[in-house]
Amino acid sequence: MKLGRAALALLLLAPCVVRAVEPISLSLALAGVLTTYISYPRLYCLFAECCGQMRSLSREALQKDLDNKLFGQHLAKKVILNAVSGFLSNPKPKKPLTLSLHGWTGTGKNFASKIIAENIYEGGLNSDYVHLFVATLHFPHASNITQYKDQLQMWIRGNVSACARSIFIFDEMDKMHAGLIDAIKPFLDYYDVVDEVSYQKAIFIFLSNAGAERITDVALDFWKSGKQREEIKLRDMEPALAVSVFNNKNSGFWHSSLIDRNLIDYFVPFLPLEYKHLKMCIRVEMQSRGYEVDEDIISKVAEEMTFFPKEEKVFSDKGCKTVFTKLDYYLDD
């Protein structure tokens, strides 16, 4: 998370946006500044991003981005496309949209959240209205969990007050201290208003490795049965995935009221990636760097990756996460 775009702009026109790394005292000071420019929204928007400037979501553009940038994830792409486009087209949603993305490292969870943000705000993850929390960075100490709960509620309340269509992304949910995330339960529930603030248009996205074993088991069973992974349906995954995450003591969702009260709209499985998907990632990366696609280099990079299970060697250990650094070695030759 970042501070203001410039010190001068912050002093003159500072929006009431509370950053995860900002002191709470700063947010209180900014509330006073708000009154000096509240009557001049057009003037303010000449200098900084405004909530009202959010993009009008194009379902076709979102689908194109998902198809061109997210590989091997037919379930995730369908759920994200329908959930996000449907939510944003609803002028009066009953509750915030909550997506919980699950899968191994390198399968595309962070990338999917980036795509969502970019299709709603031009600045994407750098937008003033998109807020990223990383469990090990922002909530490192179990002894401070009570303080974290209070701060988290204040940060979310302040940001949604400034922009109803705020997006909150919680990464490393599997490393978050159990019970902490329950602090935001009132904001995710079916309330019109909580303490004079409506959260119904906000979006909450949770990213986690929890449940990845269950996802792999289903994908491997389909592979052993000679079925295509595209035949896997959400119903084959979602119920067992929710139970697995709820009962995982190493997950921030362990016995969470968010799951118990059915406040997570979708548990989105990200399947482990196969050899062919790694080649897709490498191919797109070469194109994005302006290199001519070289299938020989693509194959060499993909073959350097390690695969599991030990016997079958079907799925990439790290997904597409490290293929880009390995690509550097061959491009420098």
Swiss-Prot record:
Localisation: Endoplasmic reticulum lumen; Nucleus membrane; Cell projection, Growth cone; Cytoplasmic vesicle membrane
Residues in the signal sequence: 1-20
Gene3D superfamilies assigned to the protein according to its UniProt record, in alphabetical order: P-loop containing nucleotide triphosphate hydrolases
Region spans: Interaction with SNAPIN: 92-252
Recorded superkingdom: Eukaryota
Cellular-component GO terms for this entry: cytoplasm; cytoplasmic vesicle membrane; cytoskeleton; endoplasmic reticulum; endoplasmic reticulum lumen; endoplasmic reticulum membrane; growth cone; nuclear envelope
Interaction with KLC1: region residues: 252-333
Region (Interaction with SYNE3): 313-333
GO molecular function: ATP binding; ATP hydrolysis activity; ATP-dependent protein folding chaperone; cytoskeletal protein binding; identical protein binding; kinesin binding; misfolded protein binding
Subunit relationships: Homohexamer. Interacts with TOR1B; the interaction may be specific of neural tissues. Interacts (ATP-bound) with TOR1AIP1 and TOR1AIP2; the interactions induce ATPase activity. Interacts with KLHL14; preferentially when ATP-free. Interacts with KLC1 (via TPR repeats); the interaction associates TOR1A with the kinesin oligomeric complex. Interacts with COPS4; the interaction associates TOR1A with the CSN complex. Interacts with SNAPIN; the interaction is direct and associates SNAPIN with the CSN complex. Interacts with STON2.
Function text: Protein with chaperone functions important for the control of protein folding, processing, stability and localization as well as for the reduction of misfolded protein aggregates. Involved in the regulation of synaptic vesicle recycling, controls STON2 protein stability in collaboration with the COP9 signalosome complex (CSN). In the nucleus, may link the cytoskeleton with the nuclear envelope, this mechanism seems to be crucial for the control of nuclear polarity, cell movement and, specifically in neurons, nuclear envelope integrity.
Protein name: Torsin-1A
Organism: Mus musculus
